[in-house]
Amino acid sequence: MSATANLKKDYQERIVPALMKQFGYTSVMQVPVLKKIVINQGLGMATGDKKIIDVAVSELTAITGQKAVPTVSKKDISNFKLRKKMPIGVMVTLRREQMYEFLERLVRIALPRIRDFKGIESKLDGRGNYTLGINEQIIFPEINIDAITKILGMNITFVTSAQSDEEGYALLKEFGLPFKNAKKQN
């Protein structure tokens, strides 16, 4: 059975009943669900070197298994030598099977490879969504350490249908995200 089937099955069989009991939901449709995962790399240094965008696109494509899209600037900023529609970042939006696959690889393989890893911060955005900042792309096994020219970080945003931070936290905790300050549940 694939990682996707494992996480989906785990969500339906274990996570949904646990969250229904914890929050007192009357319908399965009230239970929060993970809608999408957005991976974003802001590459400000790309204004000087255009090859950085190509490298970032290929690395993010290798990490996620889906083609990465360059993001462009919206306006001119002369202090940063930035022109309108100049590529300054890379992003990927994962949904459905690829989302669950990436989540499983992130939790089981990539996060434990971070040096001195003690867990991730437990602050959500107020609407049940969570953004995780990663400083180096080399924690992913798909990246060849010898081939990289520059260490690049990324932001990984987990978008949920949760109405509150408490619901979003509970959902992500059940999916296996290793939060640092694990809140005590009653």
From Swiss-Prot:
Keyword annotations for this protein, in alphabetical order, are: Ribonucleoprotein, Ribosomal protein, RNA-binding, rRNA-binding, tRNA-binding
Disulfide pattern: none
Alphabetical GO CC annotations of the entry are: ribonucleoprotein complex; ribosome
Q: Which GO terms describe its biological process?
A: translation
Q: Quote the InterPro entries the UniProt record gives.
A: Ribosomal_uL5, Ribosomal_uL5_bac-type, Ribosomal_uL5_C, Ribosomal_uL5_dom_sf, Ribosomal_uL5_N
Q: Does the keyword tRNA-binding apply?
A: yes
GO MF annotations in UniProt: rRNA binding; structural constituent of ribosome; tRNA binding
- Protein family: Belongs to the universal ribosomal protein uL5 family.
Against NCBIfam families, the record matches this protein to:
PRK00010.1
Q: What is annotated about its quaternary structure and interactions?
A: Part of the 50S ribosomal subunit; part of the 5S rRNA/L5/L18/L25 subcomplex. Contacts the 5S rRNA and the P site tRNA. Forms a bridge to the 30S subunit in the 70S ribosome.
The task this protein performs is described as:
This is one of the proteins that bind and probably mediate the attachment of the 5S RNA into the large ribosomal subunit, where it forms part of the central protuberance. In the 70S ribosome it contacts protein S13 of the 30S subunit (bridge B1b), connecting the 2 subunits; this bridge is implicated in subunit movement. Contacts the P site tRNA; the 5S rRNA and some of its associated proteins might help stabilize positioning of ribosome-bound tRNAs.
Name used for this protein in its record: Large ribosomal subunit protein uL5
* Source organism of the structure: Porphyromonas gingivalis (strain ATCC BAA-308 / W83)
Question: What's the name of its gene?
Answer: rplE
